[in-house]
UniProtKB/Swiss-Prot annotation:
Feature: compositional bias, Acidic residues: 211-221
Transmembrane stretches, start-end: none
The species this protein was found in: Eremothecium gossypii (strain ATCC 10895 / CBS 109.51 / FGSC 9923 / NRRL Y-1056)
This protein's GO CC annotations: nucleolus; preribosome, small subunit precursor
Region of interest (Disordered), residue spans: 189-221
Chain's role: Involved in rRNA processing.
Name the record gives this protein: rRNA-processing protein EFG1
Name of encoding gene: EFG1
Major localization listed first in the record, in broad terms: nucleus
């Protein structure tokens, strides 16, 4: 009997490991299906399953939910990378041009404080454009004219992100450091940009997709 229980536990552990292996890097729909399967199993057979199997399945369920959150975040990052590609491309060119102009002023001004301050600001702007998180709506540094009330809200969000970028720039923790940006580097496909926990403005993956779509053409908020 003990051997039978041990065999069941090993099989449950193997099945759980296999489920997790299949979920790693998978799309959200596939992971959701696996979550439903585990939930259905626990709902129907909890009274008859050994405690060890129940614990194993509950751990699997928790891990699958974490992987689902990661999958939804990756999908949102891919969507936003495509959606805001052109605006970020043009803003990077503009930020690079302004940085070079500021650098030239520093080199020709014999250490003028105002020129140095301007250069630091241009460095910050360049890092902002390149490292802005893919998991949230891009907020342009150089926006076109907009409604005054909307402009106030947008400016507040922009300032919040700039503070995060400035902090990570000073700490040397930016996903793409300034020296790499100046060499033409940008965020790779796996990176989602700066951590936005400090700005409290990250989109919740999978939430209100229709509202997100309504903003599809609003590149220059």
């Amino acid at each position: 009997m003990a051997n039978l229980k041990s065999a069941r536990h090993r099989k449950a552990a193997y099945d759980s490991s296999l489920q997790l292996a299949n979920a790693l890097g998978a799309g959200a729909n596939k992971i959701k299906k696996q979550i439903r399967n585990v939930e259905r199993l626990l709902a129907k057979k909890r009274d008859t399953l050994p405690d060890t199997v129940i614990v194993e399945k509950e751990r699997t369920l928790e891990a699958l939910r974490l992987e689902l959150a990661s999958a939804e975040k990756r999908a949102l990052a891919r969507k936003n990378a495509k959606k805001y590609h052109m605006v970020r491309f043009f803003e990077r060119k503009k930020a690079t041009r302004r940085y070079k102009q500021a650098l030239k002023k520093v080199e020709t001004s014999a250490g003028d404080d105002a020129a140095l301050t301007d250069l630091r600001q241009r460095e910050l702007e360049l890092c902002y454009v390149v490292n802005f998180p893919k998991t949230t709506k891009y907020i342009a540094l150089y926006p076109v004219e907009e409604d005054p009330e909307a402009a106030k809200e947008t400016a507040a969000k922009r300032d919040a992100f700039l503070k995060v970028v400035a902090k990570q720039l000073s700490e040397g923790t930016l996903p793409v450091p300034l020296e790499q940006i100046l060499k033409g580097k940008k965020l790779n496909k796996e990176s989602t940009g700066i951590s936005v926990s400090d700005s409290e403005d990250e989109e919740e993956p999978g939430r209100n997709e229709e509202a997100h779509e309504e903003e599809e053409d609003d590149f220059f908020e």
